[in-house]
C-alpha cells in the first residue's frame, strides 16, 4: 500500500463529493491487488489496476459538496454509493445495465476510477447515492457489492416459493446474506451446502430449509431425497471446479434448471454438451447488479 496525496476534488455539474466514513474490503479487491484471477490449468486472467489508482468500491460516506446541477440530495446526509458506473453512452448503459459497460470505458469506483480507500470520493452523478436507512456505518457500503450481488443472483433463479428447490453453495458472507434476502424478499428458504460445519450450523440458525456438508460422499443423494428428485436452481458463491462438479449433479433429471455462477475462486470446467440441450439447462454468470436492482434492494433495507 502506498499513501498518495491529492487536492480535494471540487464537484462540478452533476458531480457530488462524498467524505468517506467506511469502505469495505471485498474479496475481489484481493484478486485485483494480486493482479489476476485463476483461469485454471495455470492460466491467469489479469486484473491489474492502473498505477496510483485508489481502490475501494463498498463506500459509505457523508455528502459534503455538490455541483451546480445537483438538486435531489442533501449535504450533510450519509449515503451508500452505487459504484458500478458506466460510460453512459454504450448500448448497455442506455438500457440500464451500466454494470455491463465495457472494462475499457466503465468508470467503476475503485476499479477504473479512484475509489473509497481515501478521505473523499468524487461521484459523477447524484443518482448513484442511496439512503441506507438505519444500517450500521461499517456495513452500509457492503450493500452496494455483496448485498446487490446476492439480490441480483436470487432474481435470476426465477424461483417462486419453492424452498426445497433452490440450493446455495457456499455459506460465507455472500451465501449467508443471500439466505437472509431469500427469506425476507422472496419468501424462500433455500437449502445450503458448504464444507464447514460451523457455517452450516449458522445457516440453519438463520433459516435454511436444510444444510448439507459437501464432504459427505452421498451428499448428492441427500439433497435429492430432501428436494424430491433434485433442485431447480443453484447459486454458486464459491465458483470452483469442485463446486461446479457438485452443483450440476444436484439437478437430478429435472429440466429447465438454472445454475447461477457468482464466486470467483477460479479454475476450468468441462461440460457434457448434449445434457445441456436435453435438460434445457442454463449456466449464467451473475456480476453485481443493476442500478434498478440497487433501488429495489435499498428499499428493502430501509
Located regions from the model:
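Glycine-rich beta-strand-centered segment in the early N-terminal region that forms part
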Residues: 7-23, 38-91, 133-135
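Local beta-strand N-terminus motif with an aromatic residue
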Residues: 76, 163, 208, 229-232
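N-terminal Rossmann-like NAD(P) cofactor-binding module of classical short-chain dehydrogenase/reductase
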Residues: 80, 232-235
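Mid-domain Rossmann-like dinucleotide-binding core that forms the NAD(H)/NADP(H) cofactor-binding site
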Residues: 128, 133-217, 221-222
